């Protein structure tokens, strides 16, 4: 039998429609929780609470510098975390900026559910097991 793959993923998306698309695509693997508006401290706190090992960050041209800085900041604080950027797949600048900031991969909004789930499965196999920190002092 297959192992229990129920995980929690965090996502910063453009809107509720994009969040719902991501939740639908990843429903067989776990739950996708909105990480709010993109505050670094808020995102890091959610990672600690949910033990998420994968975070989706939506990118757009209007906020690209701040979104790239967010990816860099998260990875500086939590280097073992995997970041997957979301955005317009036809916009090469978004893809390049995501990779330069340290994202592991890029997914175009509206991609097929099987593609998104396959990507998450592959990334999850490469990530270290996340265990709760029992030393909270």
PLM regions and their residue ranges:
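Conserved phosphotransfer microenvironments
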Residues: 42-43, 53-74
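Short hydrophobic/Thr-rich beta-strand motif most characteristic of the beta2 strand and flanking loop
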Residues: 31-39
């Amino acid at each position: 039998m297959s192992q229990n793959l129920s995980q929690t993923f965090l996502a910063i998306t453009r809107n509720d429609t994009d969040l719902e698309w991501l939740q639908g695509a990843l429903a067989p693997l776990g739950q996708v929780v909105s990480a709010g508006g993109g505050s670094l401290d808020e995102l890091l706190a959610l990672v600690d609470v949910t033990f998420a090992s994968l975070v989706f960050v939506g990118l757009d041209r209007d906020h690209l510098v701040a979104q790239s800085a967010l990816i860099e900041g998260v990875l500086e604080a939590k280097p073992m975390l995997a970041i997957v950027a979301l955005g317009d797949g036809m916009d090469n600048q978004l893809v390049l900026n995501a990779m330069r900031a340290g994202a592991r991969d890029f997914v175009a909004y509206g991609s097929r559910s099987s593609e998104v789930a396959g990507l998450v499965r592959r990334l999850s196999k490469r990530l270290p097991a996340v265990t709760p920190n029992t030393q909270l002092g």
